[in-house]
Amino acid sequence: MYGQKIDFKNHPYGSLGKDNLLSANTSIGDIDNDGDVDIAVANGRHWSQFNQIFYNDGSGFFRRSKFIGFEANTSYLANLVDIDNDKDLDIVVANDRMKNQIFKNDGKGNFTFDAFFGRQISNTRGLCLADLNSDGFIDIAEANRKTQNFIYLNDGRGRFTNEIAFGDSFEATINIVASDVNQDGNLDLILANRNKQTNRIYFGPAFKDFIYFGEGDDETRKVVVADMNQDGFDDIIAINV
């Protein structure tokens, strides 16, 4: 096996936030529409902390930051996505044992709480943000560990009131990605399951039929799709512990 050696240099101001942050994930994008990439950080996991935005000053330094919202959360994800098709990035937050949240962007990188979605008891570990019903709007697939997984369809205004259960109520799902696995023109959902449960692929647009993949006790934490052998088909990379 041959690899390519690439050296990375430490950034002189390479640390973000404080030492006591229990960060679970980051999402990057141009939050304030100034042409550079900013960072949203999900903090807390099982313990409530404030999620945070770090603004790029244009030279790769992140001296300015803001909290997302006015209360601490048990967050696993703070994903940047244009949820209401207004050409700016909003934030969708996945929480553990708390309802998930949507924060709308005013176009200048200022965020206002907009709505909750999901159930209070959901142990959300992951969110897949994709147009699952091919109507031009971003929908949400919710990965809930040891509770029911749900799909929330966007009504075109960034509202998610249509709740659709999929899979088994006991699936210990950690991560979901969308890909047209069988190339039928519909996105499918690829699930990473832990607790010695086999990973699954649910076929769209109904997300009822599924197949297994993996060894059955992989303890998968994340899945990624890419055309690894350049044959025109998405392959799956599973990250296991």
Give the location of each predicted region.
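Acidic carboxylate motifs that coordinate Ca2+ or other divalent cations, activating on Asp/Glu
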Residues: 34, 38, 86, 90, ...
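Hydrophobic beta-strand segments that make up the repeating blades of beta-propeller
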Residues: 39-44, 91-95, 140-143, 189-193, ...
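Short glycine/acidic-enriched loop and turn motifs that connect beta-strands
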Residues: 44-48, 98, 147, 195-197
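Beta-propeller blade termini
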Residues: 24-33, 76-85, 104, 125-134, ...
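Beta-strand-rich domains and repeat architectures in extracellular enzymes and scaffolds
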Residues: 16-33, 39-41
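Solenoidal tandem-repeat scaffolds enriched in leucines and small polar residues
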Residues: 122-130, 136, 142-147, 171-178, ...
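Blade-edge motifs of beta-propeller repeat domains
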Residues: 2-21, 55-73, 104-122, 153-171, ...
